Amino acid sequence: MSYRKIDASGVLKSIDWPTVLIYLLMVIAGVISIYAASYDFDEAGMLDFSEFSGKQALWIALSFGLGFIILLIDSRMFETYAYPIYILILILLFITPFVAPDIKGSKSWIVLGPMSLQPAEFAKFATALALAKLFSGYNFVLTAKWSNLARAGLIICLPIILILLQKETGSALTFMALFFVLYREGISGLLLFGAVFAVVIFVVAIKFTETAIMGIPTGQFWILVGVMAVMVVMLFIYNKRFNVLRNVVGWFALSAAVMWVLTLCGVQVPGMVVMLSVIGIAAVYLAFEALKGHAYKLFVPALTPVIAITFMFSVNMAFDYLQPHQQLRIKVVLGIEEDLRGAGYNVNQSKIAIGSGGLLGKGFLNGTQTKLKYVPEQHTDFIFCTIGEEEGFWGAMIVLGLYVALILRVIVIAERQHSTFGRVYAYCVASYFIFHFCINIGMVIGLCPVIGIPLPFFSYGGTALSIQLAEMGIVLSVSRQMKPTKAR
């Protein structure tokens, strides 16, 4: 394949300047926020290289150089070398636990003299390239056959497994954002619903375990009720014969009535056995109807309870796999335990800082919670609380607005691509940003457990910043292949 020769003047003329402007505003605001978060009264200036803000500014300068080099490279070259890059990063991920030092129970950082690198960040970049390369294959259609879906899932899951071996759960979860890309490329929304339903099952099964209904832990009881409700809703969607829906609803209603009467009569009902039997009989009936009438869509409501109930019983096993401090953080977020001086300390102090900022904030460098170091990690994962305290509600809204604008701009670039590679890659980057943005803000305000997800362009970190700029550099590179907008 021959590649286009690209000169610097051509890059400056064809670059997507609105996206560049938004990005510049964010990285500049990020350096200022890091300076504010790490500032003390005896500290040197913002650009002093001995301080976090100065180091971040140096990383920005180096990253801009890297980004400009990327812009000078024909984007088709990234498509050509996507798989080799992906394989090299997988090898690096495999090696990392054997050479990385143990830092807070995780072996995910490779130390090279004064510099530390996190291969998981490079894996995000490489996985996006590999996924885009797969989709750009000749006549590749994700939904055409199951093997295509399996290949896409394998590309996403391999780095997840290797990163989990490093005990770096937060970084591994980031790759789940790529399933939004699969949805954009034609996968059924049923799988996204399944992912949301799995999260609901996980939360309910863990949170409601202290009490019981009919001898069943309260969480599991309501999950089973929810499974029956989902089966009925799916029958509305996938079933064209009213008698099947009527029979299933009637079976559920009759079973509930019998159980209620027996309970009133003082009969000890083995609740779990009965409910599993009721759901199981309904699932077998639907499978029989699917085979008898060649209505294969009925297999969806027939198999859904099997998968959901299996996952419900495996929740405790999955929860036990987590590190003790991760379990405690989840319990604190769900309100199972209160530990304001331990696992819940960061989040509690963060919420105090944001709440004290009010509408307009306390002013630049005038924060009390942040300046007195009440919030740990405030220059990395919890940097948003510095913004909320010093700049207030309006400052926080401006930052959120910049994120929304950048994500929408990347999506626009994706939708206007001539090439499948460019479209899928841009959507991968947008999905990463959405995940980081939502989870980090959720962590800071107590809606999500603290899992070490930084805020892109704002949190301190050279590796993450360099990879984010490289990702944006390729997005800007492929943006030169955008379809022209139609004149109105």
For the regions a protein language model found, what residue spans apply to each?
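Short, charged juxtamembrane terminal tails flanking transmembrane helices
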Residues: 2-3, 482-488
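Helix-boundary and loop/linker segments of multi-pass membrane transporters
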Residues: 11-12, 148-149, 372-375, 417-418
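Pore-lining and gate-forming transmembrane alpha-helices of multi-pass membrane transport proteins
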Residues: 385, 396, 427-428, 456, ...
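Short, Lys/Arg-rich, polar N-terminal cytosolic tail immediately upstream
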Residues: 1-13
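TM-adjacent membrane-interface loops and short helices in multi-pass inner/ER membrane proteins
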Residues: 329-383, 391-395
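Transmembrane alpha-helices of multi-pass inner-membrane enzymes
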Residues: 28, 229-234, 446-483
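Hydrophobic alpha-helical transmembrane segments of multi-pass inner membrane proteins, especially
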Residues: 22-25, 32-33, 42, 46-341, ...
